Amino acid sequence: MSSLLTKTRMLNKILQKSGTEPVAFQDICTLLSEVLECNVYIISKKGKVLGYTFGKDFECEAMKKKVIEDKKFPEDYNKTLLEVNETLSNLPNEGRCVFQEIGKCKKVDKLSTIVPIIGSRERLGTLILARFGNPFTDEDLVIVEYSATIVGMEMLRAMQDEITEDTRKKAVVQLAIGTLSYSELEAVEHIFDELNGNEGLLVASKIADKVGITRSVIVNALRKFESAGVIESRSLGMKGTYIRILNEKLIDELKKIK
């Protein structure tokens, strides 16, 4: 078995990436599974599986279905996980499956370790490890808790990136709307009311007649939105124009104007 220092160095290699490149949760799961010889799962606060690696020769169809197919742990089990506020190590399964609806477990020597993932004093998720017959040592737990800290930092980073991207998308839409004339703005409001979703077919002449504007006003408005990357459009000849919204903030921002 590798020493604590060797294991830590292996984990640190994951972090030796550029400052802008996020650490993949799957990479952490894979490495932990290799160095600790166990199953590893990273679960979000809502129970979504963000990363996982099964240990060598692991056989459990129930677990594989939850993780691989559903990509989500049952709500009742996740609720139990969220009640854990500090590391719980080497929990025996005592012949019971962690999923209540399944009941008995064929393996009677399974040991689980549950580690809360916390960032900025907020519960972000859970790191779960499972091994058969061989308890997790204090040395193992040092590695596991260090890993949970890394995962917490990456979750916070991902959340910040999501907020930044959300802000950027709103700004792009607001700039695009700001380039429209009054009649063009009136046109796009009717266009996206008619669209009834994120994509669809538009007949410009019908909307022009309905609103009382020229067809060129509609065409100019669509061109401005397309050049801003907010929508994409494609002429289908006599059938009309196919429109697809690329920036999901568009509809929300248009609603604010009404």
Curated annotation (Swiss-Prot):
UniProt protein name: Global transcriptional regulator CodY
Q: What does this protein do?
A: DNA-binding global transcriptional regulator which is involved in the adaptive response to starvation and acts by directly or indirectly controlling the expression of numerous genes in response to nutrient availability. During rapid exponential growth, CodY is highly active and represses genes whose products allow adaptation to nutrient depletion.
User: What domain of life does the native source organism fall in?
Assistant: Bacteria
Provide the alphabetized UniProt keywords: Cytoplasm, DNA-binding, Repressor, Transcription, Transcription regulation
Question: Which residues form the DNA-binding region?
Answer: 204-223
Cellular compartments per GO CC: cytoplasm
Intracellular or extracellular location(s): Cytoplasm
GO annotation, biological process:
negative regulation of DNA-templated transcription
Q: Which family does it belong to?
A: Belongs to the CodY family.
Q: Which gene encodes it?
A: codY
What SUPFAM superfamilies does UniProt report for this protein, alphabetically? Answer: Winged helix' DNA-binding domain (SSF46785)
Organism of derivation: Clostridium beijerinckii (strain ATCC 51743 / NCIMB 8052)
- Return one GO MF term: DNA binding
- Residue ranges of region GAF domain? 1-156
Task: Note the InterPro entries from the entry.
Answer: CodY, GAF-like_dom_sf, GTP_trans_reg_CodY_C, Transc_reg_CodY_N, WH-like_DNA-bd_sf, WH_DNA-bd_sf
